[in-house]
């Protein structure tokens, strides 16, 4: 790996494919450098984890209900004993509305992507076609050096 990496290849491939699967060294640090380069190139980044996402399509693009952890407490009403359902706005729409005027778009960077199912990965592969301002980067696993490929190719390999 080069001593100083500009990140131009990653940015070029992200704009070309729309969704990338990355393999990062397990000691970490490299993904932060590439996120910084994406921000310097005019993108806004949203860093989330794949664990606990639930229905990925609903979480990202639709109003969805969540229940807070009940911590052993029961509600006194006649509803479910696990608590009230709170409805949250779609996370992508909320962030796209807040983009600066000169921003190139939103990069959704998902860590721990190895736990996502093939259907979820297929949806995330097609997400940049549904919303052109959104690009997707998913950490698919570890490697000795930081490398990336189109998310569609990582889907075929799994």
Curated annotation (Swiss-Prot):
InterPro entries: NAD(P)H-quinone_OxRdtase_su_N
An example Gene Ontology molecular-function term: oxidoreductase activity, acting on NAD(P)H, quinone or similar compound as acceptor
Cellular compartments annotated: Cellular thylakoid membrane
Keyword Membrane among record annotations: yes
Transmembrane segments annotated in the record for this chain: none
Annotated membrane topology: Peripheral membrane protein
Alphabetic keyword roster: Membrane, NAD, NADP, Plastoquinone, Quinone, Thylakoid, Translocase, Transport
Enzyme class at the top of the EC tree: translocase
Catalytic activity: a plastoquinone + NADH + (n+1) H(+)(in) = a plastoquinol + NAD(+) + n H(+)(out); a plastoquinone + NADPH + (n+1) H(+)(in) = a plastoquinol + NADP(+) + n H(+)(out)
EC number(s) recorded for this UniProt protein: 7.1.1.-
GO CC annotation: plasma membrane-derived thylakoid membrane
Lineage top rank: taxon: Bacteria
Family annotation (Pfam families): NdhN
Family: Belongs to the complex I NdhN subunit family.
PANTHER family listed in its UniProt record: NAD(P)H-QUINONE OXIDOREDUCTASE SUBUNIT N, CHLOROPLASTIC
Oligomeric form and interacting partners: NDH-1 can be composed of about 15 different subunits; different subcomplexes with different compositions have been identified which probably have different functions.
Record function comment: NDH-1 shuttles electrons from an unknown electron donor, via FMN and iron-sulfur (Fe-S) centers, to quinones in the respiratory and/or the photosynthetic chain. The immediate electron acceptor for the enzyme in this species is believed to be plastoquinone. Couples the redox reaction to proton translocation, and thus conserves the redox energy in a proton gradient. Cyanobacterial NDH-1 also plays a role in inorganic carbon-concentration.
Name of the protein in its database record: NAD(P)H-quinone oxidoreductase subunit N
Organism: Nostoc punctiforme (strain ATCC 29133 / PCC 73102)
Encoding gene (name): ndhN
């Amino acid at each position: 790996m080069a001593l100083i990496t500009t990140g131009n290849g990653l940015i070029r491939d992200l704009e070309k494919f729309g969704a990338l699967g990355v393999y990062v060294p397990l000691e970490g640090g490299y993904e932060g450098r590439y996120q910084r380069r994406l921000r310097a190139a005019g993108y806004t980044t949203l860093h989330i984890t794949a664990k606990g996402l639930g229905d990925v399509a609903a979480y990202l693009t639709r109003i969805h209900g969540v229940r807070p952890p009940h911590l052993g407490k029961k509600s006194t009403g006649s509803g479910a004993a696990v608590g009230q359902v709170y409805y949250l706005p779609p996370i992508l729409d909320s962030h796209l509305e807040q983009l600066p005027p000169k921003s190139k778009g939103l990069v959704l960077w998902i860590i721990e992507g190895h736990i996502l199912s093939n259907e979820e990965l297929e949806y995330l592969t097609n997400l940049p076609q549904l919303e052109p301002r959104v690009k997707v980067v998913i950490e698919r696993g570890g490697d000795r050096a930081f490398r990336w490929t189109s998310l569609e190719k990582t889907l075929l390999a799994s």
